[in-house]
Amino acid sequence: MSIQLGIGGFKPFPVKFVDENKYGDCKALTNYMRNLLKVAGIKSYPALINSGYRSFPADPSFPLDVFDHVILCIPREKDSVWLECTSDHNTAGFLGSFTENKNALLLTENGGVLVPTPRSNYKNNQLSTKTDIILDAEGGAHAVSSIYATGDIDGLFYEVNKEDTDTQKEIYVHYFNYKEPDEFVLKEKEQTGIGTTYHFELSYDKIYDFNAGNKYFLPQRIYQLSNEKINPSYSRRNEYLFRYPYEKTDTTIFHLPEKFSTDNIPSPVELNNDIGYYKKQIVINKEARSLTIITQLNLKKSIISANDYSKIAEFYASVQKNEDQKIVVLSNDRAVAQN
């Protein structure tokens, strides 16, 4: 929603308007919060800003009206607190990729002041997934999964959680790159610290990618940990932008049925440079007939210089090569017809 009023469209509606109508755009809601804080004796300033992770910060050396959004700044002695007043979910002080790492124009009693907004690091955007996959003797499976998400990643799952079940399933498959389930049930969600934990269950008539006789070739997890497609041969002159830095961790536990055993497993690996980190560990418990894969993927920064483009392309190519390895399990009591 955008309600235009005043020169340049930046004059907010009065507090009374928001209070009575229970809605407002970024200007009106920011002004409403500013006045609430004022009553509590807390000083704050509206801040004009240009939004979107692909839009570059306002240039202090070249005056130009590039602003299309308003947020609120609460100045403090050591650091400022920034509020995105249009969000009912963002953690206080977290801006995210929409307005982070920009130059905001504070509207103070002494005039306009251009100040930088904070930049998130990969610890601010976490995705931690744990999945138990119970295989049956026919190659099907039931998966019980929980996701803990913070920052921008939490914002994505929060919006998806508002949709109906069919739409959620479609988004999980086509956007989050989950293997398409035959049944999908989103369970309860719960606020956990600064993030949210989401619980869901999935059922598959066929969890394996393909089979050869009594050998099943399984994916390492029910979704792709990385879907970055970066052309390593491309010559780049400008910076390469990711939406945000992140830390992804995944623990997937395969529970094998009786008379099943592991035939081949992916190799452990660790990759590290100043841009990314990737590590994979495998634990086999023969007594419990389980195979656990623990994986971590960090993107340490979201703005990649042109000089580092080949480095990040090669890093993600190596990650994908490792992610494409299959788990091979063997059915020891019968041969499975080849598909």
Role assignments for model-derived ranges:
Residues M1-N339:
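A sensor for short, sequence-defined functional sites
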